[in-house]
């Protein structure tokens, strides 16, 4: 376990830092999947708003 000791003798624990990496550009398949998820979400929200307007 990694820790440091300060002047008063107290121990400070530090979390293990994850490895940092740069994100890769999206593949065409990932772009299509993201577009479908966004479209489905918009349809869901539009449908719920339409139901709310219809009920009120």
UniProtKB/Swiss-Prot annotation:
| Residue spans crossing the bilayer | 34-54
The residue stretches assigned to a coiled coil in this entry are none
Listed GO cellular component terms? photosystem II; plasma membrane-derived thylakoid membrane
Top-rank taxon of the source lineage equals Bacteria
Q: What is its main location?
A: membrane
Q: Which UniProt keywords apply?
A: Membrane, Photosynthesis, Photosystem II, Thylakoid, Transmembrane, Transmembrane helix
Q: How does it sit in the membrane?
A: Single-pass membrane protein
Name any Gene Ontology BP term.
photosynthesis
Q: Which residues lie on this side of the membrane: Extracellular?
A: 55-56
Tell me, how does this one assemble? Part of photosystem II (PSII) assembly intermediate complex PSII-I; crystallized from a strain without psbJ, it forms monomeric PSII before addition of the oxygen evolving complex. PSII-I includes 3 assembly factors not found in mature PSII (Psb27, Psb28 and Psb34). The N-terminus of Psb34 (this protein) binds to CP47 (psbB) in close proximity to PsbH on the cytoplasmic face of PSII.
Q: Which family does it belong to?
A: Belongs to the Psb34 family.
Function of the molecule: Involved in photosystem II (PSII) assembly and/or repair, probably in conversion of late PSII assembly intermediates into mature dimeric PSII.
Q: What is this protein called?
A: Photosystem II assembly protein Psb34
Instruction: Write down the species.
Output: Thermosynechococcus vestitus (strain NIES-2133 / IAM M-273 / BP-1)
In the UniProt record, what gene is named as encoding this protein?
psb34
């Amino acid at each position: 376990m990694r820790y440091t000791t300060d002047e008063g003798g107290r121990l400070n624990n530090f979390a293990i830092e994850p490895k940092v990496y740069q994100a890769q550009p999206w593949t065409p398949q990932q772009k299509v999947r993201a577009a479908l998820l966004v479209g489905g979400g918009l349809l869901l929200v539009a449908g719920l708003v339409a139901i709310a307007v219809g009920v009120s």
